[in-house]
């Protein structure tokens, strides 16, 4: 099956569908079409590909489960922050640490640096490549050494630069910033024998270039779906000085001639005693080929015995990580542009070309950002959407209405909107009246779908912005729900001191999203990590662990609350025990808090009132305050100062003055306060949205654990 379009058929309820056979196993990017207009579907899975949010689906191959989530010990996936000395940008990298990393504090680990392809980014190897599951499974089966794996965003564009093929000098960023950062923050084994470089497509060319340029740093090279003759020849020519230990080159069977071009070099490496060779897999230039490539490469590398664990006797000097002072304007731009699919978005397209030797020599063409601030003081925003052949295009800003875009140059549509209030705004895009997703604008999860959003800067709100303070770590952890039998994902923030003070224990806040959103909301829409970093750096907040879980739990038995699911039961039976096992918590109620917004606020009240043995601190943001209703009666606590004080150190209740629930929340707050119960209340101009909830967090976090 090639690039032909598949016509869907309308059912009787306004939906379109089609059952298709003959699709090859693997990961498949795809596009949707509305009246012939190419769009992205907001209710289908989305990843970052082709320089934007792009839909995908998976067809599992029979008997191929090496990349599946399995019941084995899971490593930790961490989102780390560093600064590029090449272009002065704040960058994020994803770092995988193996299951033993926290259990064996005296052990050092080899490091694999692995790069994405053109049009993709630092999220690709986790969400598309399933790298963490592949490593978990290989390690559990004893097929690979335990290792740290680092996944970076391989773009290092300078302003007004016009690079050919390689997107800026990312090699210098790897050598001068990334490796020093990793060596400074992780227990790494020293020496080139304990360091590998690999990549796919563009990333394979970068990997080959980096190893040729910095042969003193790497002894292992993985080239997936690529070939660089000049650099491969250079590595061979210096083999006596810098002997390679592993060189694996791979290709899909459909990448005609690539396997033989690779084999011409791998045969020469093998003649020198270098492990690896060339491998070819069913498929084309696509993720299921690269997953298999990673699996095979991970099995080969770091087989040097004890040295790979101790890192001793290399004679390599220590790396020093230092950050240059950052530009505030640049940090602000990145604050308002960051989103779950890409931390430091670039708006580019690739114009494919080849040089006289047949090597890729494409250039990068600037694209419009889907939503950009024109004048923050006037609340003026400009929307840009590419929609070739569309009849109508609209931007639907939640709470404001729809705004028609007009045709502009080169298939773009645009409009300028004034009067947008400060803060965070979800917006939808409609093409010919159909809801779609703009791949060139920030993407979040809201309304039970992928959705675009924009940021109108709040000039007097400094705490939610990226600043050059010590940065905490965001972890992606998997645990099993006893309520549903499913594996759940939670995001966990640990403060900057967590790795530096291994004997220290921390209080914990469980912080929940609202209905229609998920575990990623507080990090990307709520800017929780930025808030915590800045408040801690200013001495205004106690250092704490913050856990953000998926607030949905639907057991097959049907035993769950119709509005809040069985999440509160799951948190008690599974979530808290997992966090206390995994992190250095202070596991008592005096050092445990729960808070949430909207549905998460309702879940918070339900959970903390039912479990006084677990929590002393609570926060309800836009979730109302129930004294009594048809389901529960909390009056014996909320109207009795002595009983309240026995249970709570603090109950924080917040509601925006523009919210539909403001009057009822205010009435119940006043009744509780009139009874002499010292709840903390917070209100201000605000709607039921992330703008207000960020301010709730800013006020709530400094009050905890004091």
Language-model region placement:
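Non-catalytic cap/lid and distal C-terminal segments of serine-dependent acyl enzymes
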Residues: 1-402, 407-706
């Amino acid at each position: 099956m090639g690039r032909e379009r598949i016509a869907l058929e309308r059912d009787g309820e306004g939906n379109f569908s089609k059952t298709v056979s003959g699709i090859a196993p693997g990961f498949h990017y795809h596009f949707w079409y509305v009246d012939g207009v190419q769009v992205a579907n907001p209710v289908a899975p989305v990843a970052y590909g082709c320089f934007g949010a792009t839909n995908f689906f998976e067809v599992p191959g029979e008997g191929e489960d090496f990349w599946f989530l399995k019941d084995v010990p899971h490593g930790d996936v961490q989102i780390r922050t560093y600064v590029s000395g090449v272009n002065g940008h704040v960058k994020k990298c994803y770092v995988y640490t193996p299951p033993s990393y926290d259990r064996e504090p005296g052990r050092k680990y080899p490091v694999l640096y692995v790069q994405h392809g053109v049009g993709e980014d630092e999220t690709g190897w986790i969400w598309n490549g399933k790298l963490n599951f592949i490593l978990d499974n290989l390690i559990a089966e004893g097929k690979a050494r335990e290792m740290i794996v680092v996944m970076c965003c391989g773009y290092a564009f300078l302003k007004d630069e016009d690079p050919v093929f390689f997107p800026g000098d990312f090699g210098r960023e790897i050598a001068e910033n990334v490796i020093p950062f990793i060596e400074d923050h992780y227990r790494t084994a020293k020496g080139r024998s304990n360091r590998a470089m690999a990549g796919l497509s563009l990333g394979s060319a970068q990997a080959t270039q980096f190893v040729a340029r910095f042969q003193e740093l790497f002894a292992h090279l993985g080239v997936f779906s690529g070939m660089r003759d000049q650099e491969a020849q250079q590595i061979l020519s210096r083999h006596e000085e810098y002997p390679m230990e592993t060189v694996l080159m791979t290709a899909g069977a459909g990448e005609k001639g690539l396997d033989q071009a690779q084999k011409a070099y791998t045969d020469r490496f093998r003649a020198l005693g270098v492990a690896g060779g060339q491998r070819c897999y069913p498929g084309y230039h696509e993720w299921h080929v690269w997953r298999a490539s990673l699996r095979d490469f991970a099995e080969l590398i770091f087989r040097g015995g004890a040295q790979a664990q101790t890192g001793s006797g290399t004679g390599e000097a220590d790396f020093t990580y230092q950050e240059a002072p950052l530009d505030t304007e640049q940090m602000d731009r990145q604050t308002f542009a960051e989103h779950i699919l890409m931390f430091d978005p670039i708006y580019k397209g690739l114009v494919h070309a080849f040089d006289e030797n047949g090597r890729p020599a494409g250039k990068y063409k600037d694209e419009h950002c889907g939503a950009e601030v024109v004048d923050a003081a006037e609340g003026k925003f400009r929307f840009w959407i590419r929609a070739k052949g569309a009849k109508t295009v609209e931007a639907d800003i939640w709470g404001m209405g729809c705004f028609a875009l007009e045709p502009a140059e080169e298939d773009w549509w645009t409009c300028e909107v004034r009067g947008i209030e400060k803060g965070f705004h979800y917006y939808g895009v409609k093409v010919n009246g159909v809801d779609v997703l703009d791949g060139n604008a920030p993407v979040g999860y809201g309304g039970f779908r992928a959705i675009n959003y924009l940021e109108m800067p709040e000039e007097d709100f400094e705490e939610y912005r990226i600043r050059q303070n010590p940065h905490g770590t965001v972890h992606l952890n998997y645990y099993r729900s006893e309520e549903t039998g499913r594996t759940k994902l939670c995001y966990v923030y640990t403060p900057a001191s967590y790795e530096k003070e291994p004997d220290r224990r921390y209080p914990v806040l469980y912080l929940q999203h609202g209905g229609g959103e998920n575990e990623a909301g507080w990090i990307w829409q709520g800017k929780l990590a930025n808030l915590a970093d800045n408040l801690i750096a200013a001495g205004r907040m106690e250092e704490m662990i913050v856990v953000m879980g998926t607030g949905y739990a639907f057991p097959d038995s049907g035993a769950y609350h119709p509005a809040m699911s069985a999440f509160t039961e799951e948190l008690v039976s599974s979530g808290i025990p997992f966090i206390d096992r995994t992190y250095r918590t202070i596991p008592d109620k005096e050092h445990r808090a729960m808070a949430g917004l909207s549905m998460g606020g309702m879940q918070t009240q339900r959970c903390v009132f039912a479990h006084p043995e677990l929590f002393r601190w609570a926060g309800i943001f836009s979730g109302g305050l129930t004294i009594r209703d048809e389901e529960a009666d909390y009056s014996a606590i909320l109207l009795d100062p002595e009983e309240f004080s026995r249970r709570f150190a603090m109950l924080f209740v917040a509601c925006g003055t523009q919210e539909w629930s403001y009057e009822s929340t205010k009435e119940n707050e006043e009744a509780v306060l009139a009874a002499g119960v010292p709840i903390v209340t917070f209100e201000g101009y605000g709607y039921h949205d992330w703008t207000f909830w960020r301010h709730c967090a800013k006020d709530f976090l400094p009050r905890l654990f004091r």
